[in-house]
Curated annotation (Swiss-Prot):
<dbReference type="InterPro" id="IPR044943">
    <property type="entry name" value="NOS_dom_1"/>
</dbReference>
<dbReference type="GO" id="GO:0020037">
    <property type="term" value="F:heme binding"/>
</dbReference>
<protein>
    <recommendedName>
        <fullName>Nitric oxide synthase oxygenase</fullName>
        <ecNumber>1.14.14.47</ecNumber>
    </recommendedName>
</protein>
<dbReference type="Pfam" id="PF02898">
    <property type="entry name" value="NO_synthase"/>
</dbReference>
<comment type="function">
    <text>Catalyzes the production of nitric oxide.</text>
</comment>
<comment type="subunit">
    <text>Homodimer.</text>
</comment>
<feature type="binding site" description="axial binding residue">
    <location>
        <position position="66"/>
    </location>
    <ligand>
        <name>heme</name>
    </ligand>
</feature>
<dbReference type="InterPro" id="IPR050607">
    <property type="entry name" value="NOS"/>
</dbReference>
<dbReference type="InterPro" id="IPR044940">
    <property type="entry name" value="NOS_dom_2"/>
</dbReference>
<dbReference type="InterPro" id="IPR017142">
    <property type="entry name" value="Nitric_oxide_synthase_Oase-su"/>
</dbReference>
<dbReference type="InterPro" id="IPR004030">
    <property type="entry name" value="NOS_N"/>
</dbReference>
<keyword id="KW-0560">Oxidoreductase</keyword>
<dbReference type="GO" id="GO:0006809">
    <property type="term" value="P:nitric oxide biosynthetic process"/>
</dbReference>
<keyword id="KW-0349">Heme</keyword>
<keyword id="KW-0479">Metal-binding</keyword>
<dbReference type="GO" id="GO:0046872">
    <property type="term" value="F:metal ion binding"/>
</dbReference>
<dbReference type="InterPro" id="IPR036119">
    <property type="entry name" value="NOS_N_sf"/>
</dbReference>
Amino acid sequence: MEEKEILWNEAKAFIAACYQELGKEEEVKDRLADIKSEIDLTGSYVHTKEELEHGAKMAWRNSNRCIGRLFWNSLNVIDRRDVRTKEEVRDALFHHIETATNNGKIRPTITIFPPEEKGEKQVEIWNHQLIRYAGYESDGERIGDPASCSLTAACEELGWRGERTDFDLLPLIFRMKGDEQPVWYELPRSLVIEVPITHPDIEAFSDLELKWYGVPIISDMKLEVGGIHYNAAPFNGWYMGTEIGARNLADEKRYDKLKKVASVIGIAADYNTDLWKDQALVELNKAVLHSYKKQGVSIVDHHTAASQFKRFEEQEEEAGRKLTGDWTWLIPPISPAATHIFHRSYDNSIVKPNYFYQDKPYE
């Protein structure tokens, strides 16, 4: 099947579903006729603002790995298909961080840059998340976030220098079409909310000097809507506490802080049968939730998130849509058996529109 035909089939499926949901079925025929002419003439077509907005929302709703999909229809969609210069991209990314952060009352937001043209990226964002900590490794010593080591090395090759602390903010880094090298820009500190991690009952917890940033803005996935590929489309919700407390700060291949947590909460870390890891995880996660709430930054605990996902399941059934999900990602990393998600199965079929992983340009 040739490319135009594949695109036309994707467009037909999307427009039919999108317009049906928007209550505009009577407009489908005319819109598809326009799209067909456009594809025949140019090999592609351009979404209306309404199609783009609803398509991005549908993509969130179809994201099998996301437990937070109840709020799919509240997504704030920023259309920046008009950008042409590095400065415009930089300013749009700064604006995304500011509007999504919303002084701590986090707003689910996506900024959509120009789509690929004939497979060529107009804007290529290198960051995994717009806000993330650098990682350094030398002579067996690890500083910062090991998950960021390869991107940090790429930034250093381009002349960026971090302070080599555990929490250096990586710069924004992206490449424009036609440029051989990407450009980087430091993040203004005033844009980034960071939360020092303290414990509601254990004062010594603050001695660990842990912190995390407020907003997780995924920036290396591709949004696909009706056969059009928006490879640069950073998006965010808010954190579920376990993402920070049971993964980012706890994983052995990340910040690996469980032994230090055990120490400050006063338990021995000698025997697996003492369940010290479990105890340390609970206290660390309690501290994360407490700290974000104390600073007025949106966050959700995994039990509430699972209850919200139950409501999403019910909503989808009422709407007559087939629910899809990836069980291995939907179960929270601590106490999964205490959620309904653990005790049922999900169909992991991929439905479009959706978000897709892309190869990293720096690896």
